[in-house]
Amino acid sequence: LVHHALDGRPLTRLINTHSHSDHIGGNAALKAAYDCEIIVPAGLHAAIADWDEDALLLSPLGQQSARFQHDSLLGAGTEIEMGGLNWQALAVPGHDMEALAYYNPEQRILISGDALWENGFGVIFPELLGEADGLTHAQATLEMLSRLPIDIVIPGHGRPFGEVDLAFERAFRRVNQFRNNIEQLAWHAIKVIVSFAMLERRSIAHADFPDFILGLPFAVDVNARFLDMPHDAMVARVERELLLVNALKLQDGKLLAPG
């Protein structure tokens, strides 16, 4: 995919917004293929240098990423040139407490990572892990970003989008829902993590699905902390709701990820 997008051009730098596996999982392969410089948010230095799988949320979420070493760090408040434009690095804690977004005021473009999507934002993991007041930080991040003149957002997931005011309305509404109902956030997070783990696994025997879910430390811990559902009830509800939205498919005794 990257080779096709480059169309013969060199890849000289790889700049991350945050450290979750779906954003850093290709770093090692791209470094090997293109010998590009890897730049990460400054707050991630120790976690990446020591390859702390708990801090990187690899082990807790049942996810994988090939180990890599970064070449340089980027701190909030600094500027970096990308694509002939100067971008401001902005601290956007919430989904990831060390995350950065990148903003170009001349073209009014925001590279938001998972701090803002067209319909919401990434799971607020710190709130659920008891590490920080993630929802308060997410609210403050949205308030800060909403004050910027923005015409186009390039999110960490989904297509670039305009109509930014509507996206902020949806995001604020969602963060308020979660603040008023932490159990809703907890359940949403469990489903997201199981869906993501299944995208990597691709298929699993239906009979093995309970052990698969209960092998995800995050799902078990969040259920115990916020929901207190019996394990069999949690597994059955996850399966039922993911099948309902076509995030899973049951076929020939197997549960299959889409695609």
For each predicted feature, which ranges?
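Surface-exposed alpha-helical segments enriched in charged/polar residues
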Residues: H3, E143-S146, R240
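Residue-level marker for the onset of beta-strands and adjacent loop->beta junctions
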Residues: A76-T78, E98-L100, L244
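Active-site HxH/HxHxD metal-binding segment of metal-dependent hydrolases
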Residues: V2-M82
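Metallo-beta-lactamase
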Residues: N86-E183
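Soluble or luminal CAZymes and related metallo-dependent hydrolases
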Residues: S72, D133-H137, P230, M234
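C-terminal regulatory/interaction regions
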Residues: W187-G259
